[in-house]
Amino acid sequence: MIPGEIIVAEGDITLNADRDAITLNVANLGDRPIQVGSHYHFAETNAALSFDRAATLGRRLDIAAGTAVRFEPGQTREVALVPFAGAREVFGFSGAVMGKLDKD
C-alpha cells in the first residue's frame, strides 16, 4: 500500500445517492477564474458568479469530496447541487447564514 492510496471495491460508486439534486446554469461574469470546492455553500460563492442564489440556499456541488469546479471568465456551465446533510448548519464562508439552514 502507498501512503494515501485508496483501494475501492470493483463496480460503480454512486455519490450522493437518493439526494434531491437540482441543476442550474452558472456564469462567471468576472475577469478572473473562480474555483468552488465540493462542500462550499453555493449560495455564498463569489459575487461574479451569476445564478439564482435563492435556489441554492443550503446546497453544495454534487461532486466528489475534495474536488472543485472552475469557472473561467465569461464561461457558463451547468452544475448539479445537492442539499447539505447532517445537522444542516452553515458557518463561515461569506457569513450569510451562520447557523441553522432549517427554521424549527
UniProtKB/Swiss-Prot annotation:
GO terms for biological process: urea catabolic process. One of its GO terms (cellular component) is urease complex. Pathway: Nitrogen metabolism; urea degradation; CO(2) and NH(3) from urea (urease route): step 1/1. Gene3D superfamilies: Urease, beta subunit. This is Urease subunit beta. Heterotrimer of UreA (gamma), UreB (beta) and UreC (alpha) subunits. Three heterotrimers associate to form the active enzyme. The lineage of its organism: Bacteria, Pseudomonadati, Pseudomonadota, Alphaproteobacteria, Hyphomicrobiales. Keywords: Cytoplasm, Hydrolase. Its main location: cytoplasm. One of its GO terms (molecular function) is urease activity. NCBIfam families: PRK13203.1, urease_beta. Belongs to the urease beta subunit family. It is found in: Cytoplasm. InterPro entries: Urease_beta-like, Urease_betasu_sf, Urease_subunit. HAMAP family: Urease_beta. It catalyses: urea + 2 H2O + H(+) = hydrogencarbonate + 2 NH4(+). Its EC number is 3.5.1.5.
